């Protein structure tokens, strides 16, 4: 098991950020490379248990909404299938099937900004843990910067 963690301060009010990310199906609106997303079985994007299927960089990914709190400004998702990337992965180093990510927001009172922390924990073979942690440790900042750019376009 391994965990990747990233945090930063976004120069946007908490409610503005939460309004954008609270819908589990809204990934294409703020993550570069996500071209479409669909919630299966007609569930809503804030319903725990909802499954989203989204296309990221040409790869289809399925995740289940495992936790959602409007009061706590957080959402947690869990992988359902092995991650389909990176495409050059060796069959000896399979992609993790079990992983869980959490996006959590807190208000920064000074300047009306938002603290965001994004954690992804992956259940991997011990010999693959560092490789997966390093990958996610580089991807999460990219995703967060994509969110920041999207928010900048909306103001």
What are these regions (language model features)?
Residues 29, 38-94, 142, 150-154:
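Glycine-rich portal/gate segments that line the openings of hydrophobic small-molecule binding cavities
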Residues 6-8, 62-67, 98-108, 120:
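Hydrophobic/aromatic beta-strand elements that line small-molecule binding cavities or substrate pockets
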Residues 14-15, 66-73, 104-115:
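A short, structured loop/turn motif at beta-sheet edges
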Residues 12, 83, 105-107, 122-124:
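Beta-strand elements of well-folded, non-transmembrane domains
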Residues 17-21, 27, 52, 65, ...:
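Hydrophobic pocket/interface hotspot
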Residues 1-42:
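Hydrophobic ligand-binding cavity/cleft-lining segments
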Residues 92, 115, 119-155:
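A conserved amphipathic terminal alpha-helix motif
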Residues 10, 56-58, 109-111:
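A generic beta-sheet turn/junction motif
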């Amino acid at each position: 098991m391994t965990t990747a963690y990233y945090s930063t301060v976004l120069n946007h009010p908490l409610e503005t950020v939460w309004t954008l990310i609270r819908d589990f199906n809204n990934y294409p609106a703020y993550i570069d490379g996500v071209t479409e997303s669909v919630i299966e079985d007609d569930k809503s994007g804030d319903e725990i248990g909802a499954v989203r299927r989204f296309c990221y960089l040409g790869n289809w990914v399925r995740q289940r909404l495992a936790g959602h709190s409007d009061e706590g400004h957080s959402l947690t998702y869990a992988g359902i299938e092995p991650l389909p990337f990176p495409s050059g992965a060796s069959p000896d180093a399979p992609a993790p099937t079990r992983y869980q990510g959490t996006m959590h927001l807190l208000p920064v009172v000074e300047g009306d900004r938002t603290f965001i922390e994004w954690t992804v924990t992956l259940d991997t073979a011990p010999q693959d843990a560092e490789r997966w942690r390093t990958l996610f440790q580089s991807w999460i900042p990219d995703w967060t910067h994509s969110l920041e750019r999207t928010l900048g376009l909306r103001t």
